[in-house]
Amino acid sequence: MTMSTTAVTTDEYRPTGRPTHRVEVYGADGARRILRPARPADVRAIAELVRPYAERRVLVAKDLISYFEDIQEFIVAEEVPGGVGGAGGETPSPAVPRIVGCGALHVMWDDIAEVRTLAVQPDALGTGLGSAVLRELIAQARQMGLKRVFCLTFEEPFFGSHGFEPIEGTPVGADVFSEMLRSHDDGLAEFLDLARVKPNTLGNARMLLHL
């Protein structure tokens, strides 16, 4: 059973007055989950979700303040009551909503962004949730008029299944490269393949999706 996604319209509003974009998904485990923009109140749940991956150096470890500063880049997958259970109906819905997945889209230039901090709870692995989060981030990139999406990952087969291809070097011209060098963002330094961040990228695949 593959995860299905259905966009739903809500009357929920962010502090800016703009309505949130929410996508309702049902996974292979029958759980009902909502993909939505992250809020500051989600930061600690995101940090706790990422922590075991960061401890294994699968994802970059970040201070709590970094999540607050970047929260507008994140979407979360929130598991909510109302799921249908697993194949045998034995998987209960949570009594209260919980964050079971996250991902971020960081714009690096006028035509390119990076997928960052894509993670799901261990008990949601294999349900299609990671793919649903990634598809939503790619959809956001398209809506913003971006042409390419970059990722730095150990999960080459997963991203490859979504159209990402391995790359060598830095896929920008010299003028853009020199402008990007002005940034203090480590993720952008990894995109540029700078020597100072090489220890952080060992074993990772550099991949690019053309939209």
Language model segments and positions:
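A conserved beta-strand-loop-helix scaffold within acyl/acetyltransferase catalytic domains
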Residues: 58-75, 79-80, 101-120
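Conserved active-site alpha-helix within GNAT-family acetyltransferase domains
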Residues: 143, 147, 153-181
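Ala/Thr-enriched low-complexity intrinsically disordered regions
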Residues: 2-10, 16, 87, 91, ...
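Short amphipathic alpha-helix that is part of the acyltransferase structural core
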Residues: 8, 14-60, 78, 98, ...
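Conserved acetyl-CoA-binding loop-helix of GNAT-fold acetyltransferases
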Residues: 120, 126-139, 150-151
